């Protein structure tokens, strides 16, 4: 057991589905065969979630990762906050829960940087609550990058059938062409290639490149970004151990990608990658941040206030995220 990686699982929003899906996931005994799970959150909130799910699990507060027992049936939790669930408005973001969410994340990141845990799996957070607590970062990824001093990082969405990475992430569609640059493309491919080799065990990664424009621009008739930016940037990798294929029109690319033709697809913008990904991996998709000095995976969904407190939230993405964190940690040994 001691040879298995310790995965710090942040609870996410105390009034979202995070606590419930963690309980459901840790009911699966197989999780303890691949890692040592450590919940970083709030003891009372987790006990409330257990009373709803009735999984039969007990929760044991631990003072540190070294103090945890990692025994199936007795979930170890680092109680970073001490909230009173009865005083929290259900399904409602507030500054108190926002502050707690940030503390869960920063605690986990700091333990991972010190190698006291080997990976972090994050539960869903509510950005309005985080902003109400006085923080201005856009989301998990930006906070993780700031906390670890990382300037070059890539968002990957990963599942058994498809992996996608994004050259641009959260911005208006009208702004995308100006941000699809040679420098950003090369950075995205380099970070992704390194992660595929080191964390996914793929020594010579093959990646498809999605075109920005319909029909890959059709010789400039529908845009020139392929001709002027993407294809010249792809030339940078000729002769390297990263093989690039494309740029392919996005309307046909994903049919072949989900059949395993490539190890990842480089997408130019958010919805180009996430729409096909979620069509395939809606219940078991994983968000993992590449380029950080720590391993971070996350569920591929939000706080789901409409399901919070019902016990009906699907835990497939949380289980998949923990499994992927354990895989990456094992490959890095």
Curated annotation (Swiss-Prot):
Q: What keywords are assigned to this protein?
A: Cobalt, Cytoplasm, Magnesium, Metal-binding, NAD, NADP, Oxidoreductase, Pyridoxine biosynthesis, Zinc
Q: How is the cofactor bound?
A: Binds 1 divalent metal cation per subunit. Can use ions such as Zn(2+), Mg(2+) or Co(2+).
Please, which domain of life does this record's source organism belong to?
Bacteria
Q: Where does substrate bind?
A: 140-141, 278, 287, 296
Annotated signal peptide: none
Q: GO CC: one term?
A: cytoplasm
- Required co-factors: Zn(2+); Mg(2+); Co(2+)
Q: Supply the SUPFAM superfamilies for this chain.
A: Isocitrate/Isopropylmalate dehydrogenase-like
Q: What class of enzyme is it?
A: oxidoreductase
- Name its pathway: Cofactor biosynthesis; pyridoxine 5'-phosphate biosynthesis; pyridoxine 5'-phosphate from D-erythrose 4-phosphate: step 4/5
Record bears the keyword Metal-binding: yes
Q: Which reaction does it catalyse?
A: 4-(phosphooxy)-L-threonine + NAD(+) = 3-amino-2-oxopropyl phosphate + CO2 + NADH
| Alphabetical list of Pfam families matching this protein | PdxA (PF04166)
Q: Which residues bind a divalent metal cation?
A: 170, 215, 270
Q: Where in the cell is it found?
A: Cytoplasm
Q: Which cysteines are joined by disulfide bonds?
A: none
Task: Give one GO term, molecular function aspect.
Answer: NAD binding
Entry's EC annotation: 1.1.1.262
Predominant localisation class: cytoplasm
> What PANTHER family would the database entry show?
4-HYDROXYTHREONINE-4-PHOSPHATE DEHYDROGENASE, D-THREONATE 4-PHOSPHATE DEHYDROGENASE
What family does the database annotate? Belongs to the PdxA family.
Miscellaneous comment: The active site is located at the dimer interface.
State the function annotated in the UniProt record.
Catalyzes the NAD(P)-dependent oxidation of 4-(phosphooxy)-L-threonine (HTP) into 2-amino-3-oxo-4-(phosphooxy)butyric acid which spontaneously decarboxylates to form 3-amino-2-oxopropyl phosphate (AHAP).
**Protein name as catalogued:** 4-hydroxythreonine-4-phosphate dehydrogenase
This chain is encoded by the gene named pdxA
């Amino acid at each position: 057991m001691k040879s298995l990686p310790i995965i710090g699982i942040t609870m996410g929003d105390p009034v979202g589905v995070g606590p419930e899906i963690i309980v459901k996931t840790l009911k699966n005994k197989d999780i303890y065969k691949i890692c040592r799970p450590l919940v970083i959150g709030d003891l009372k909130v987790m006990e409330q979630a257990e009373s709803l799910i009735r999984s039969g699990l007990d929760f044991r507060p631990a003072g540190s990762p070294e103090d945890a027992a990692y025994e199936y049936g007795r979930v170890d939790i680092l109680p970073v906050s001490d909230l009173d669930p009865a005083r929290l408005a259900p399904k409602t973001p507030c500054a108190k829960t926002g502050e707690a969410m940030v503390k869960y994340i920063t605690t986990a990141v700091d333990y991972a940087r010190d190698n006291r845990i080997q990976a972090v799996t994050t539960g869903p957070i509510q950005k309005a609550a985080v902003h109400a607590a006085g923080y201005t970062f856009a989301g998990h990824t930006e906070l993780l990058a700031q906390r670890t001093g990382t300037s070059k990082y890539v968002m990957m969405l990963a599942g058994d059938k498809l992996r996608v990475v994004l050259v641009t992430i959260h911005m208006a569609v009208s702004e995308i062409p100006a941000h699809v640059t040679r420098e950003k493309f090369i950075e995205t491919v380099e970070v992704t290639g390194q992660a595929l080799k080191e964390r996914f065990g793929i020594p010579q990664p093959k990646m498809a490149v999605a075109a920005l424009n319909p029909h890959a621009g059709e010789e400039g008739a529908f845009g020139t970004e392929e001709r002027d930016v993407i294809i010249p940037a792809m030339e940078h990798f000729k002769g390297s151990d990263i093989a690039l294929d494309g740029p392919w029109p996005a309307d046909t690319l994903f049919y072949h990608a989900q059949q395993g033709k490539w190890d990842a697809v480089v997408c130019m913008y958010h919805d180009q990658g996430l729409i096909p990904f979620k069509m395939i991996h809606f219940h078991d998709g994983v968000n993992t941040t590449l380029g950080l000095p720590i391993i971070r995976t996350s569920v591929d969904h939000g706080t789901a206030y409409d399901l919070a407190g019902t016990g009906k939230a699907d835990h497939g993405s949380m289980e998949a995220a923990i499994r992927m964190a354990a895989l990456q940690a094992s490959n890095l040994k």
